[in-house]
Amino acid sequence: MALPVVAIIGRPNVGKSTLVNRLCRSRDAIVHDEPGVTRDRTYQEGFWGGRTFRVVDTGGLVFDDDSEFLPEIREQASLAMAEACVALVIVDGQQGLTAADEAIAAWLRQQKCPVLLGVNKCESPEQGLAMAAEFWALGLGEPKPISAIHGAGTGDLLDQVLDFLPPQDEEEAPEPIQMAIVGRPNVGKSSLLNTVCGENRAIVSPIRGTTRDTIDTSIEREGQSWKLLDTAGIRRRRSVNYGPEFFGINRSFKAIERSDVCVLVIDAEEGVTEQDQRLAGRIEEEGRACLVVVNKWDLVEKDSHTMPAMEKELRSKLYFLEWAPMLFISALTGQRVERIFPLAVLAVEQHRRRVTTAVVNEVLQEALSWRSPPTTRGGRQGRLYYGTQVAVRPPSFTLFVNEPKLFGDTYRRYVERQIRQGLGFEGSPVRLFWRGKQQRDAERDQARAASR
């Protein structure tokens, strides 16, 4: 059973994102003293009174202006209201009742979702009730004075939220696979998210930097739960000013860190850029499973040779991710989009896979039979005694040798290729740790390992 949803609604700069961070005990929602920082619907999990629910933060509602993203923000707010059990409408107690608040109240009365009214920025308990009193005029029920920044009154508000949540399902839901959708600005990440979800979950625009938050979306595919993380486009550092986009990019890197698998989106028309390479390196550095999705394939003139030729060219530049599957799609038409999920499942399975020591050493012995370790000019030869898997996520192996410095980069890459050829791990990075050991100790430890 999906978690119930609580929507946060209000005009710009009343403290909605600060309240989200307070309710969810996080800093995932971007807070910045500038209207319009939040644009898409962003989701986080909240917990109160033994209940877990999803809090959806929405952009600031403005009804007398249709410039930039404001119509799309209103659409996102409507979608949030449609899926919510209850909406928390936030107003600014210090600024007082405004015409914008009255316009939002009129819009809310057309919605079917029940409403609770929170009067934010009431840091003084003595003045809070007086500040909240004028908001009775909105006709949205009792205005509750709160302070999102200090937490005052938020507990009482959450107690009321619990009354609107459906009965709790006692059966525990399995952990979803977390998939981060990452890439440069304007490669089609939000279009891909919308195609996958079958709705406008994210605002799509040709303007770079439209997505600023990391947008969490929960869906199910063939019995598997997924949490999709659509991230802000990552540009060159000197192109980014301090502000909402700066914070959004930091959220993107955090999304990579907390993901199980990354979908790196490449623009088929533009090919691989320096920023794509840096992003690929970041994914590999974090040790995340990955697949490369080449979007806008519908815009490329092609014949039967175009795809293999382009894949070869792209892989030559994305050498960090030579192990990642590559898929050519069109987020606009939906071409091959559904293939992303089985490839992602396979990558996650390989990322979590463990292999017995006996099987690891069969592969290593075959590698040694095909190509002996290098010998120095002085006649010293590297000796690889045995190996064992020491970790998963990503799969990591310790190889015991006489002297690690005798094994150069070329031979180390050869051993990794042989491990992949013999054991698989498609879609997952592999870590090899070369550790020096005396021959006698290595033989004793190998015998013990073989018995396990």
UniProtKB/Swiss-Prot annotation:
Residue intervals passing through the bilayer: none
PROSITE patterns: G_ENGA
Domain (KH-like): residue spans on this chain: 353-438
A GO BP annotation: ribosome biogenesis
Pfam families reported in the protein's UniProt record: KH_dom-like, MMR_HSR1
Source organism, top-level taxon: Bacteria
Binding site for GTP 2: 183-190, 230-234, 295-298
Keywords: GTP-binding, Nucleotide-binding, Repeat, Ribosome biogenesis
InterPro entries according to UniProt: G_ENGA, GTP-bd, GTPase_Der, KH_dom-like, KH_dom-like_a/b, P-loop_NTPase, Small_GTP-bd
Cited CDD domains: EngA1, EngA2
EngA-type G domain mapped to chain residues: 4-169, 177-352
Residues holding GTP 1: 10-17, 57-61, 120-123
Function: GTPase that plays an essential role in the late steps of ribosome biogenesis.
UniProt record similarity statement: Belongs to the TRAFAC class TrmE-Era-EngA-EngB-Septin-like GTPase superfamily. EngA (Der) GTPase family.
Protein name, as recorded: GTPase Der
Organism in which the protein naturally occurs: Synechococcus sp. (strain RCC307)
Gene assigned in the entry: der
